Amino acid sequence: MKKKHVAVLMGGFSSERPVSLSSGNSCADALEAEGYRVSRVDVSRDVSRVLSELKPDVAFNALHGPFGEDGTVQGVLEYLGIPYTHSGVLASALAMDKDLAKTVAKSAGIPVASSRVMNRFEIGDKHPMEPPYVVKPVAEGSSFGVVIVREGQSHPPQVLGSAEWGYGERVMVERYIPGRELTCAVMGDRVLGVCEIVPVGHSFYDYDSKYAPGGSRHVCPAEISPNIYQKIERLALKAHQAIGCRGVSRSDFRYDDRLPGEEGIVWLEINTQPGMTPTSLVPDIAAQAGIGFGALLSWMVEDASCPR
């Protein structure tokens, strides 16, 4: 049977462009190895014209950040009638807004950290909540703009009010959750497993930890009790379903193992466009579940649809 023509969308114009190019080229190489006819599309503002001319059978969305994972390009693909991978317009927009995604997760009974959304200029010189807390852009990924305010710091970081800040006006101020960094991948209605992320030389899972070779160590499967492991799997699937995700998603958690039972589990966010670089988590978790990179991507292509 003739393999499909797949347009791999990558690059774009968000702050996550380099990550997207890495993801996109990794995916394109693997899909070509699987026998698909692949067109690599470095996305610009005329992407609708480019896709109209290419006429692909499927658009594989390897974009990250605004435009690529906030429902915008998904809307373009729906308008053009091109089947595409990952989540649809509504789920993508919802998951991209960390505050709205937390609201939905909480309503579904998923434990989340207390937080509030503010304009960054409101923060000024006074702590918006008792340290320790985390300040993060409401709609960015790859840990761009994440600032941890520790106990003992006399005032919030000055960068929040400076011209150097390039991550939008709305920020989420969230209670800092100590403990272990865990993540869980979901593929359709199947949970693939839980992985622990151990940053190497960094205090938390920041941009360098995520994408620099050797920046972090992935312990897959996570070395936690079976009860906690299974609970995190159930919560990740519940978040995937509550937000309306399709294809592959990845939920991030903190787990404070000093607390009794399941009390230390806190859901942080869901990623509807998880990275697919050589150092990314979802390919590692899938491999532990017996699914190779090429097989994972082939499943995503065959799962593509329009509408989503």
UniProtKB/Swiss-Prot annotation:
Tell me the pathway.
Cell wall biogenesis; peptidoglycan biosynthesis
Q: Where along this sequence does the record place binding of Mg(2+) 1?
A: D252, E269
Q: What is its EC number?
A: 6.3.2.4
Localization: Cytoplasm
Per its record, the protein catalyses:
2 D-alanine + ATP = D-alanyl-D-alanine + ADP + phosphate + H(+)
Chain sites annotated for binding ATP: 128-183
Which keywords annotate this record?
Answer: ATP-binding, Cell shape, Cell wall biogenesis/degradation, Cytoplasm, Ligase, Magnesium, Manganese, Metal-binding, Nucleotide-binding, Peptidoglycan synthesis
Name any one Pfam family assigned in the record. Answer: Dala_Dala_lig_N
HAMAP family referenced in this protein's UniProt entry, alphabetically:
Dala_Dala_lig (MF_00047)
This protein's name: D-alanine--D-alanine ligase
What is the protein's species of origin?
Chelativorans sp. (strain BNC1)
